[in-house]
């Protein structure tokens, strides 16, 4: 079975949410590992546990609270996922990406993705923020794509383009906003590569990924972006560099999830402030003009 959900399942979940909240979000934000604190910045917040939302999967990873939060961020109507779903939790990609299609049916036109990632680019330091310019869908090389199976034209075309997956205008606005913030470290920009996980990468794998042109590596984000672009959503996103990958066989260091969460905690406030400021740069929907 390529997709266990029908169009009616997505629609029923969207209608349930619309009937349980007065919020009508324009922007959806997916909070990565340790980045759920962004929800604290929402005003008029309304919270739903994933468990109470029809058809919603459950989040099982430390650092992912498993809550959907509606509210306003810097004046912009938002819905935030405080915890995402991953392949390594045993979820098929159609389940990992379920919320994105629901957001589309809620009227969302922009998706912001954030994640914790390992730095492959030797210029990156722990705590850096990388603006995602492009991605490499490594699981896709072996047939793992969230759009696999029959296409539903009500969501989008059979063969969506991915050459412009990350909105160019929003990337330019992010770069100029960062300069205005006067941060000491420059905003990095690069390519994110997704691996399936949950095991961290070997030294040999890190070397291969670097040769492929990847700047940061993680275990999420790409499936949601593919489905969002299929639905016609504007997408932009950021990786918080929480560790530098191990490229040396002589190194005694080991990657671990606790380290990722700790590094994320230190740098998360900077990313949260940045995303909040950027909300004002997102074009208003046509119907509001």
Swiss-Prot record:
UniProt-reported outcome of changing residue 257 to W: Reduces catalytic activity towards inosine
Where in the cell does this protein reside? Answer: Cytoplasm
Q: Does the keyword Zinc apply?
A: no
Regarding tissue, the record states: Expressed in red blood cells; overexpressed in red blood cells (cytoplasm) of patients with hereditary non-spherocytic hemolytic anemia of unknown etiology.
**Transmembrane region(s):** none
The residues that hold phosphate are: 33, 64, 84-86, 116, 220
This protein's GO cellular component annotations are: cytoplasm; cytosol; extracellular exosome; extracellular region; ficolin-1-rich granule lumen; secretory granule lumen
- Which GO terms of the molecular function aspect are on file? guanosine phosphorylase activity; identical protein binding; nucleoside binding; phosphate ion binding; purine nucleobase binding; purine-nucleoside phosphorylase activity
Question: Could you name the domain of life of the organism this protein comes from?
Answer: Eukaryota
Q: In this chain, where does the modification Phosphoserine occur?
A: 251
Instruction: Report activity regulation.
Output: Inhibited by 5'-deaza-1'-aza-2c-deoxy-1'-(9-methylene)-Immucilin-G (DADMe-ImmG).
Pathway in which the depicted protein is active: Purine metabolism; purine nucleoside salvage
Q: Which UniProt keywords apply?
A: Acetylation, Cytoplasm, Disease variant, Glycosyltransferase, Phosphoprotein, Purine salvage, Transferase
Q: What is its EC number?
A: 2.4.2.1
Q: Which positions are annotated as binding a purine D-ribonucleoside?
A: 88, 201, 219, 243, 257
Q: How does the record describe its quaternary structure?
A: Homotrimer.
Q: What does this protein do?
A: Catalyzes the phosphorolytic breakdown of the N-glycosidic bond in the beta-(deoxy)ribonucleoside molecules, with the formation of the corresponding free purine bases and pentose-1-phosphate. Preferentially acts on 6-oxopurine nucleosides including inosine and guanosine.
Which disease is reported for it? Purine nucleoside phosphorylase deficiency: A disorder that interrupts both the catabolism of inosine into hypoxanthine and guanosine into guanine, and leads to the accumulation of guanosine, inosine, and their deoxified by-products. The main clinical presentation is recurrent infections due to severe T-cell immunodeficiency. Some patients also have neurologic impairment.
Report the PANTHER family cross-referenced here: METHYLTHIOADENOSINE/PURINE NUCLEOSIDE PHOSPHORYLASE, PURINE NUCLEOSIDE PHOSPHORYLASE
Q: What is this protein called?
A: Purine nucleoside phosphorylase
Query: From what organism does this protein derive?
Result: Homo sapiens (Human)
